[in-house]
A protein has these predicted regions:
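Phosphate-binding/switch region of NTP-binding enzymes
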Residues: 48-50, 54, 58-59, 87, ...
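Short gly/ser/thr-rich secondary-structure transition/capping motifs
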Residues: 27-33, 192-196
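Short alpha-helical segments that sit at the start of domains
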Residues: 251-263
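Short, small/acidic-rich helices and loops at N termini and domain boundaries
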Residues: 1-18
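Pre-Walker A (Motif I) flank of P-loop NTPase domains
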Residues: 43-47, 82
């Protein structure tokens, strides 16, 4: 059974009353569990992957798309094969082709790319809806980068603008039970909490279901930490190393696993 456990009453809508459900009824409903594109790491919903420019987040995003489309594990995390749409809006097909050759000899037909799209409030939602209609097995959409689909807003209402934009994409993800991952940037100013470094107001990070921050201690290093936090996943820090030959971020350690082993 799906997540809809009561029907909207036209009388309630007419009287402008809240549609509610009591706890006993709610707990008796056999609701559909969340879909996970990557087990315990990336569920259906709206997510942000943030990192400094040229830190390697697009390589990570592309490899994620490839793993999901092939149904191959992302590090130690299982994936389920599905169709994937990657909006690589800062790249060309030539660059994506070159990177695919670096990553694999066999790119699947279930992995789709676009280098141009409409903006968020000017046709993008309709474009995605049409793609999902044509490719109903799609479970993951990556938008690289978030800023490419946004229009300049009023700085005086930056929080409201951030929250509204994320809300539109989250509603789209929830409606179709898919994961949408937004590739984004970090602030230049350091912070003890990596999540506070996500560019923009807390309207972005607060409205998303999960946030991932890819952060190097020094730019020239080939190691980084992926900080992961979200509503439906445990907090974890993944120590990664970028392999310059395979062009893949390889897992060195997972502090969540270490915590479980020591407990």
């Amino acid at each position: 059974m799906g997540a809809i456990f009561f029907k909207e009453d036209s009388k309630l809508k007419k009287e402008n009353r809240l549609l509610t459900i009591d706890g006993e009824t709610l707990m008796s409903q056999p609701l559909t569990p969340l879909n996970f594109v990557v087990d315990t790491l990336l569920s259906q919903g709206l997510h942000i992957l943030a990192g400094s420019p040229k830190v390697g987040k697009s390589w990570l995003a592309l490899w994620l798309c490839l793993c999901a489309a092939q149904g191959k594990p992302l590090w130690t995390f299982a994936t389920r094969p599905c169709e994937v749409l990657y909006l690589c809006l800062e790249d060309s097909f030539q660059r994506i082709q070159s990177r695919l050759f670096d990553l694999t000899e066999d790119a699947p037909p279930t992995l789709h790319f676009a280098v141009m799209s409409q903006q968020l409030h000017n046709g993008l939602v309709e474009q995605i809806e049409q793609f999902l209609k044509e490719h109903p097995q799609t479970r993951l959409i990556v938008i690289d980068t978030l800023q490419r689909i946004r229009t300049a807003g009023n700085d005086a209402n930056a929080y409201a603008s951030d929250y509204r934009d994320i809300g539109v994409l989250k509603a789209l993800a929830d409606k179709h039970r898919i994961a949408i991952l937004l590739v984004h940037h970090l602030r230049k100013m350091n912070d003890d909490d990596p999540m506070n470094m996500i560019s923009g107001t807390t309207g972005l990070s607060g409205a998303s279901d999960s946030n991932f921050v890819l952060r190097k201690s020094k730019r020239r290093e080939n190691t980084a930490t992926l900080y992961c936090t979200g509503r439906d996943i445990p907090y974890r820090e993944l120590a990664l190393e970028f392999d310059g030959e395979d062009h893949v971020w390889k897992l060195l350690s997972d502090d969540c696993e270490q915590t479980e082993q020591s407990s």
